Amino acid sequence: MVARISPGRVYAVGISLGSAVAAYLSKERPLAGVLLVTPFDSVEAIAKESYFWVPVGLLLRHRFPAAAFMTGNPTPAAVIAAAEDRVVKPPRTEALLAQLDNLVFQATLQDAGHETLYELPAYKTTLQAAFGALRDAASQAAHRRRDKSLPHPMIAAEHGSPGAAPDE
């Protein structure tokens, strides 16, 4: 079934820990876009910040390195953060943002926490705006791919390609 779905129609959405999973998916598969809500650079960085006296690097089996997954990743990305997030603090989101090569939308909702973000009326409109930006980016990318596959009119005319402008 996956083979029948055009990558230009698939978006990955990840919320909190799921943002690292969505980032990984966007690295491994061509996607139209990826939406990361309350994302972070890595679980290891969050753990080190909160438990600086513990050798978290030795204890973590899965580091969920979202920033590493997004480095050099051409997938259009949208990010929604919570200004009052106490789970994923702003420096962790900022570290991820610094690695995004194709950021098409970014919003930080004020008066929003990690768990309360979804209750705000602004969340729905922000989601809609994020998906709109991702859709626009995917559409532009599709046009660029299509334009690259078409021969330039002058080249087509020189080679007598079908549909080329006739010589005058």
Where are these regions (language model features)?
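Alpha/beta-hydrolase active-site loop
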Residues: M1-R4
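Primarily recognizes the serine-hydrolase "nucleophile elbow" in alpha/beta-hydrolase
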Residues: P7-W53
